[in-house]
């Protein structure tokens, strides 16, 4: 166990817990629900940018994505840059409308907005179930990614690393709530930027420059330096599918959408869009390029997801590697804490308080219940992550796709189409998510596109058809009422 690596990590985690304690103090002075779930809607532009980019740049950006770049070469780096406009697109499409609606209705969760917009409790229940299932899969990926990092860098077993990571995330989310999440996201986003730059420079330096690195990759496999990767796998259908899955479809991710309910004002939104796009550009290019070039430094890795932690040890001095370890840890922690908060809000706000609204008056009990739910979820995730796959990116993309198939049209058409109704939303959610799971489990790719593409098409058709049928049913009901 190398103290040079561990010491900076301990210092960093001290800052994280400090932020959580600060958030806890703030929480005790305000309304619990508003403070715990949306940080009293007080995010500045810089904080909004960092928390949105940090939440998006998860284990896949720092572990799974570079692992795929290690395996498939520079073509995957090009593919990864598709994700650059994500912050601009998500905040631009949802920002102002979500902010206005959430303030007007005092909404704290995505389901609050769904109930206000569609006036249907069954939609909220189905939404809650879909969210919990998809978040559980997505959070499992983050736990695996965090454990992989600690396992490789500080030399402990995978199980020990998993327990250490889970303990850290569970405790500071338990203490601090949403404000702790966005404060640590801001710290983490800054660490991510510098860590990415340092590792990329260290990798290129170890290889004797970019030209030398590319030559070494060519010697290993000439396909590693082509845009299409080994066996031409990165074809048009793959790239188009990937763009929909990790860029356009991100508008339908609820834990990204909830950020649009918590910023301070329009100035914060516009600044957040600009800064967030710059931050994501640096992270995506730097980490994936480091992963691809890492093949020339360490050509014989059996688990490609270990490329970043192995590179850290190989090309950086121990103290610098320790500082950089905080970067991917930051990315993973910032994603999982956001999803833990969202999952907790589903149980507490959308299910418990909707069934017992009078319980909201007892803030101490609600606070206790929220924290207990967070700890139970953390414990369940530990069990789910005990047997990890070799490449976590596919599991993460599966969770991404599930959320998008269920929620993209419900969110977008709900805020941009006045005639959208609950029948259309329910139809879209059931058909979109159902077809995605079915196509994925059966391994069916229509016209060689990823399953998310036909699922979104089916979901849109279902929304339009369900909406039309719903209009007729609503008209019949109105006629019966007026005839009385």
Curated annotation (Swiss-Prot):
A Pfam family reported for this protein in Swiss-Prot or TrEMBL: SSF
Catalysed reactions listed for this entry: (R)-pantothenate(in) + Na(+)(in) = (R)-pantothenate(out) + Na(+)(out)
Gene Ontology biological-process annotations: pantothenate transmembrane transport; sodium ion export across plasma membrane
Compartments in which it is found: Cell inner membrane
Swiss-Prot/TrEMBL keywords: Cell inner membrane, Cell membrane, Ion transport, Membrane, Sodium, Sodium transport, Symport, Transmembrane, Transmembrane helix, Transport
Disulfide bridge positions per record: none
Membrane topology: Multi-pass membrane protein
Function of the protein: Catalyzes the sodium-dependent uptake of extracellular pantothenate.
Name of the featured protein: Sodium/pantothenate symporter
